[in-house]
């Protein structure tokens, strides 16, 4: 497979928008988290991402509000601002039998460790994973554009991830980000 090494913002802008095609489940209680993790533990490979409420004050940051974990069919949006990082989620992150694929995982895990200690296992960093394929770009939007000729919308990135109710646009954005990581891994 011959791939482009890089892609311009202008090229990405002209592409059709990618959207997660599966079911999205918002997880707001510990019992919901337990059921969701039971399903996720049965999967071989998962896409993972997180969202944090943006801070517009220098030196101030918020804890991770949302952890997105996606299979090919379902994406679970764990509202960590409501449930915290529950033991079942920690057990999934530590499970060496379930591969977790994401982009900038070091940053995600650094922020998640502020919620609870854990030792993540079986994680694949896409920025490193795509390098042997000749891809030089490091952003999810550009890597996805190179491989699928579709763009990942970033319009919700700076929205309030701690809102009482997530909008449909937020849910779709969050699910697409986690699923896109999985999609990239499957293709390569």
Q: Where do the model's predicted regions map?
A:
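A short alpha/beta connector and helix-capping loop motif
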Residues: 56-73
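Short active-site oxyanion
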Residues: 95-100
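Acidic, Mg2+-coordinating catalytic module of metal-dependent nucleases/exonucleases
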Residues: 145-188
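Short alpha-helix plus adjacent loop in nuclease-associated cores
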Residues: 126-146
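N-terminal accessory regions of nucleic-acid-interacting proteins
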Residues: 1-46, 115, 126, 179
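Nucleic-acid-processing active sites and adjacent nucleic-acid-binding tracks
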Residues: 74-94
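Short acidic, Gly/Ser-rich segments with clustered Asp/Glu that frequently serve as metal-coordination loops
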Residues: 45-58
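Short hydrophobic/aromatic-enriched beta-strand-loop microsegments
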Residues: 119-127
């Amino acid at each position: 497979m011959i791939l482009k090494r890089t892609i311009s913002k202008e090229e990405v802008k002209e592409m059709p928008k990618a959207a997660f095609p599966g079911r999205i489940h918002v997880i707001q209680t510990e019992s919901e988290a337990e059921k969701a993790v039971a399903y996720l533990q049965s999967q071989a490979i998962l896409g993972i991402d997180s969202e944090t409420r943006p801070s517009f004050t220098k030196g101030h940051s918020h804890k991770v509000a949302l952890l997105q974990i996606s299979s090919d069919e379902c994406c679970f949006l764990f509202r960590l601002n409501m449930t915290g990082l529950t033991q079942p989620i920690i057990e999934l992150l530590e499970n060496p039998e379930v591969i977790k694929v994401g982009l900038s995982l070091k940053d995600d895990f650094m922020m998640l460790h502020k919620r609870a200690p854990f030792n993540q296992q079986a994680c694949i960093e896409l920025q490193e994973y795509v390098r042997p394929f000749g891809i030089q770009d490091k952003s999810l939007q550009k890597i996805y554009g190179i491989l699928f000729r579709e763009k990942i919308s970033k319009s919700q990135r700076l929205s309030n991830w701690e809102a009482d109710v997530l909008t449909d646009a937020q849910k779709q954005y969050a699910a697409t980000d986690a699923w896109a990581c999985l999609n990239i891994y499957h293709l390569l």
